UniProtKB/Swiss-Prot annotation:
Residues 112-178 form the DRBM domain. Residues 258-579 form the A to I editase domain. This is Adenosine deaminase domain-containing protein 2. Residues 27-36 have a biased composition (Pro residues). It is found in: Nucleus; Cytoplasm. Keywords: Cytoplasm, Differentiation, Nucleus, RNA-binding, Spermatogenesis. One of its GO terms (molecular function) is double-stranded RNA adenosine deaminase activity. Belongs to the ADAD family. It comes from Macaca fascicularis.
Length: 580
């Protein structure tokens, strides 16, 4: 989806422009896109095959070999799925105003029209311009038009410039209201209708992200699917590109690149083949799906020719560091349906003046072990060494704010990737507590010098409350033990049985997930060959393939957490000793 905005400097991380006005609705309702048959819902809609559950029929991804999970696939499939990504990057035309904002049912007094329109445009981040017609009509000497993000509304005419501007503002407000109430123009109009206001100029940043996550899920699964209720825990990663437009404006193109659902972890014994998914919470799964997408982007940039280099979100960079980085004017956003478990959820903590808040018990690291969430200091070492244990989503968000989303394998190839914003659809969360859980653990005191090796640095997320997309009905028990994942380039949803950490199957033990460690190690070696880094191919085990600087930053982070009484980040080197 695209809208005009004021540009940001290349490579800068700025607050999403359209999110400035986002507010929590007093009575939040699940946001639903228009049905596919509605005008503009999908432009164009992909071919659908109802025999295949209504999933889009495009080039099928060919995974490389059985056994240790699916590979990242062939380059052609990734390029073909770019088309689907563009479809998911368009917003359904939804006749709803942003949460917390509304226009009066009747036209305001002319004297108030300009200020009302200015306030409305500023709250959404829309560029508002008033343009005077140099050739007014014969009846009135002044003609002024209001332009909203490049869309010119019907002109206002009067005997003075002030009155013409007021009439132009009234005309723009009336036009916006008509678009909200009826997005389709009457076909019996006596004159050609003006170009419609883009819904991208009306929806906020959070609503746009929610629209993509909801519509992407609906495209992959319909309401008849037994997995439909998994939408209640959906999380997604949205990629935003800024593209220069006309008159110095910048268009923002949003694209859904990863989805995940789930609300629990595998609670069984550890296994050491790398074929078991441990943490199946929606946010964690969406982030792992993002990694799969990034491996594909590396192949696209290295093996896709000139077109692949243009389409990839990664670009080569000179110097001694990783050979690739995120392109300028490209941003990542996280959308989650539920408040992250752990420190962000357990208790409301008012600020304290002594700086002791990060050390309080609720802010300690917490781990899921044997189906229970408890502080890591209370987990017996024997359990950590033998059973699956996963730190809470709150703790992982705090970690990603420092180390980035890329992980230890991609750190060889891509500079740290940080999310620009987090949209949380749970209206019951406490924003200050969420912010402290992510941005204050551990305390990084610059007075003592740099605590982390470069290029790692804490990067704050812009936090927003967003509209929920979950079904209104309670999630059935059948979905509590399942986790779904998808990334841009995958032919469809993968269903994982949380109890086994493997793909759901009729047999007792299904095949490995395409998001498991073994699959990522295979993808790492595939990309290492593509980028011409033979020394990386010599790193045979998963543990050996982890980048040294990333591991050092992780060690420093764990040390600081432990020194500040928050608990040490658990380490399980034996789990990574496998080789493909």
């Amino acid at each position: 989806m695209a809208s005009a905005s004021q540009g940001a400097d290349d490579g800068s991380r700025r607050k999403p422009r359209l999110a400035a006005s986002l507010q929590i609705s007093p009575e939040p309702r699940p946001w639903r896109p228009l049905p596919p048959q509605a005008q503009g819902a999908w432009e164009p809609a992909p071919a659908m095959d109802h025999a295949e559950g209504g999933q889009p029929q495009v080039s099928v991804l060919r995974d490389s070999g059985p056994g240790a999970g699916a590979g990242v696939g062939e380059l052609g499939a990734a390029q073909a799925w770019e088309n689907l990504g563009e479809q998911m990057g368009r917003t359904p035309r939804v006749p709803v105003p942003p949460a917390g904002l509304s226009l009066p049912l009747k036209d305001p007094p002319a004297s108030q029209a300009v200020s009302l329109l200015t306030e409305y445009a500023a709250s959404l981040g829309i560029i508002l311009l008033f343009r005077e017609d140099q050739q007014p009509g014969p009846c009135f000497p002044f003609s002024v038009s209001a332009e909203l993000d490049g869309v010119v509304c019907p002109a206002g005419t009067a005997n003075s410039k002030t009155e013409a501007k007021q009439q132009a503002a009234l005309s723009a407000l009336c036009y916006i209201r008509s678009q909200l109430e009826s997005p389709e123009s009457p076909q019996t109009s006596s004159r050609p209708p003006p170009p419609p206001l883009s819904v991208d100029s009306i929806l906020t940043h959070g609503q746009r992200c929610a629209a993509l996550v909801s519509a992407g899920f609906d495209l992959l699964l319909d309401e008849r699917s037994p997995y439909w209720a998994c939408k209640g825990t959906v999380a997604g990663v949205i990629l935003e590109r800024e593209i220069p437009g006309a008159r110095g404006h910048v268009k923002e193109i949003y694209k859904l690149v990863a989805l995940g659902t789930g609300s629990s972890c595998c609670a069984g014994w550890l296994e050491f083949s790398g074929q078991q998914l441990h943490d199946c919470h929606g946010l964690v799964i969406a982030r792992r799906a993002l990694l799969r997408f990034l491996f594909r982007q590396l192949l696209l940039a290295t093996q896709g020719g000139a077109k692949g280099k243009e389409q990839s979100v990664l670009a080569p960079q000179p110097g001694p560091g990783p050979p690739f980085t995120l392109k300028p004017r490209v941003f990542l956003h996280l959308y989650i349906s539920n408040t992250p478990k752990g420190a962000a959820r357990d208790i409301y903590l008012p600020p304290t003046s002594e700086g002791g808040l990060p050390h309080s018990p609720p802010m300690r690291l917490q781990a899921h072990v044997l189906g229970q969430l408890k502080p890591v200091c209370y987990v017996a070492p024997s359990l950590c060494d033998t059973h699956v244990g996963c730190l809470s989503a709150s703790d992982k968000l705090a970690r990603w704010a420092v180390l980035g989303l890329g992980g230890a394998l991609l750190a060889h190839l891509v500079s740290p990737l940080y999310s620009t914003s987090l949209i949380l659809a749970d209206s019951c969360h406490d924003p200050p507590t969420l912010s402290r859980a992510i941005h204050t653990r551990p305390c990084l005191d610059s007075v003592l010098g740099p605590c982390l090796p470069p290029p790692y640095v804490r990067t704050a997320l812009h936090l927003f409350s967003g509209p929920p997309v979950a079904p209104s009905e309670p999630t059935p028990d059948t979905c509590h033990g399942l986790s779904l994942n998808w990334s841009l380039g995958d032919p469809g949803i993968e269903v994982v049985d949380v109890a086994t950490g493997r793909v759901k199957a009729n047999a007792a033990l299904g095949p490995p997930s395409r998001l498991c460690k073994a699959s990522f190690l295979r993808a790492f070696h595939q990309v290492a060959r593509a980028v011409g880094k033979p020394y990386l191919l010599a790193l045979k085990t998963y543990e050996a393939a982890k980048a040294g600087p990333y591991q050092e930053a992780r060690r420093q982070l764990s040390l600081l957490l432990d020194q500040q009484g928050l608990g040490a980040w658990p380490s399980k080197p034996l789990v990574g000793k496998f080789r493909n």
